Amino acid sequence: MLIHLQKVCPSEQVDHLRDLIGQGGFVDGGTTAGQVARAVKANEQLEAGARVDTVRSEVRKALMAHAGFVSFARPKTLSRILVSRYRDGMAYGPHIDDALMGGRRADLSFTLFLSDPDSYDGGELVMDGPDGETEIKLAAGDAVVYATSAIHQVAPVTRGERVAVVGWVRSLVRRPDQREILFDLDQVSAALFARDGKTRELDLVLKTKANLLRQWAED
């Protein structure tokens, strides 16, 4: 299961982040890949320093303020936030992200797109699933969140430049099926409240959600 989050960062913040990133230096992205993934990874990453620290802080705050992200991911921690850049000819072949990022279990991965989709060709995030491949290329400021266990790749960029922020989430709820149940209950409770306000039925849904989270959460 994956989710498309719209407007995680508004256009003004996207411009600010792009300015910050544009002033920084980049290093070979292979330095942060595992032994197997390194063989298929050809991109660049913003070097360590104050700029990438600022980007990490702003993106973390933006995600944690986005109701859809919080509901879907149930985040406990965000780790290893990186800024990646793909220029003409660069790509990242099929791979699986590490189970542990920064010593923490990684349940979900995210990609926050910062380049306008019409400013580059190629560069789609390609997810491998039971029904085949799904290509994802979002507006600047939008993000996609998906299972870290999924095989995925970044298609070769054939024109322009693709800049994105990527990172990993340890969820309060380890199992994806349980996270999906809680996410569905969030949607139901929001719809009930919008339609009828506070009712007995809404209270029962909220009680059920809270009790399930109490059973499943790893705090």
Swiss-Prot record:
Note on how the cofactor is bound: Binds 1 Fe(2+) ion per subunit.
Record-annotated Fe2OG dioxygenase domain positions: 77-171
Cofactor(s) this protein requires: Fe(2+); L-ascorbate
Matching SMART domains: P4Hc
Single biological process term from Gene Ontology: DNA damage response
Residues engaged in binding Fe cation: H95, D97, H152
Keyword Iron assigned: yes
EC number(s) per entry: 1.14.11.-
Record carries keyword Iron: yes
UniProtKB keywords: Dioxygenase, Iron, Metal-binding, Oxidoreductase, Vitamin C
GO molecular function, one term: iron ion binding
Domain of life: Bacteria
Transmembrane segments: none
UniProt-annotated binding residues for 2-oxoglutarate: R162
Pfam families xref list: 2OG-FeII_Oxy_3, PKHD_C
UniProt-listed NCBIfam families: PRK05467.1-3, PRK05467.1-4
Name this polypeptide is given: PKHD-type hydroxylase Mmar10_1675
Organism: Maricaulis maris (strain MCS10) (Caulobacter maris)
